[in-house]
Amino acid sequence: MGGFFSSIFSSLFGTREMRILILGLDGAGKTTILYRLQVGEVVTTIPTIGFNVETVTYKNLKFQVWDLGGQTSIRPYWRCYYSNTDAVIYVVDSCDRDRIGISKSELVAMLEEEELRKAILVVFANKQDMEQAMTSSEMANSLGLPALKDRKWQIFKTSATKGTGLDEAMEWLVETLKSRQ
C-alpha cells in the first residue's frame, strides 16, 4: 500500500521535495509558523539571524521550508535562496500598520526577481487573533496584490499562535502545486 502512495506522489511531484521560502519582515511570525507547521504546536522562538531550514510533511507531501530572517540587514541576502523555489509564503504582521509600506516594497522587489518568476505566492495575513489587525482585503490592497496579473497568489488570514488559517493556506498551496505539474 505504501508503494502505491509513493508512486502517486512521485508521479505528481517527482522525487524531489518542494522548496518553500518563508519571508517577511522581522517579528511577523515566520519562525512560529514554520514550527507550527512542523510540530503542530507553538515553540519558543528568538529572532532569526540567518535562517532555519526544516523538512515539513503536510498531507504526505514533503516540503523543504526555509525560514529567512527579516531584519533590515538580512533582507538583501534573501535573493541568495531564491533558486529552485516552488513557492513563497510571505508573512505580514496584520497589526503593523507602520511598516506595511516597507513590507510592500520588499514584496515587490522580491517578486521582480527572475528566479522567483514561476514561484507561487501565499500571503499569510498573520496575527489575526489581535483586535487591531487589518482585514485580509485591507492588507491585500496595501501590498498591491490585486495588481499581480502573471502570478498565482492567494492571501489567508492566519494566527500562528492559535494555528488558525494555516491548514486552509497549506491546502491551497498543495492543490496549486499539484495543478502545475
Curated annotation (Swiss-Prot):
GO terms for molecular function: enzyme activator activity; GTP binding; GTPase activity; metal ion binding; phospholipase D activator activity; protein domain specific binding. GO terms for biological process: Golgi organization; intracellular protein transport; protein localization to Golgi apparatus; retrograde transport, endosome to Golgi; toxin metabolic process; vesicle-mediated transport. Keywords: Golgi apparatus, GTP-binding, Lipoprotein, Magnesium, Membrane, Metal-binding, Myristate, Nucleotide-binding. It is found in: Golgi apparatus membrane; Golgi apparatus, trans-Golgi network membrane; Membrane. SMART domains: ARF, RAB, SAR. A lipid is attached at G2 (N-myristoyl glycine). It is a peripheral membrane protein; Lipid-anchor. Detected in heart, liver, lung and liver (at protein level). Detected in fetal heart, lung, liver and kidney. Detected in adult heart, placenta, lung, liver, skeletal muscle, kidney and pancreas. GTP binds at residues 24-31, 45-48, 70, 126-129, 160-161. The keyword Nucleotidyltransferase does not apply. Mg(2+) binds at T31, T48. GO terms for cellular component: cytoplasm; cytosol; Golgi apparatus; Golgi membrane; trans-Golgi network; trans-Golgi network membrane. PANTHER family: ADP RIBOSYLATION FACTOR-RELATED. The GTP-bound form interacts with GOLGA1. The GTP-bound form interacts with GOLGA4 and RGPD8. The GTP-bound form directly interacts with ARFIP2. Binds to SCOC, preferentially in its GTP-bound form. May interact with UNC119. Interacts with ARFIP1; this interaction directs ARFIP1 to the trans-Golgi membranes. Interacts with ARFGEF1 (via N-terminus). GTP-binding protein that recruits several effectors, such as golgins, arfaptins and Arf-GEFs to the trans-Golgi network, and modulates their functions at the Golgi complex. Plays thereby a role in a wide range of fundamental cellular processes, including cell polarity, innate immunity, or protein secretion mediated by arfaptins, which were shown to play a role in maintaining insulin secretion from pancreatic beta cells. Belongs to the small GTPase superfamily. Arf family. This is ADP-ribosylation factor-like protein 1.
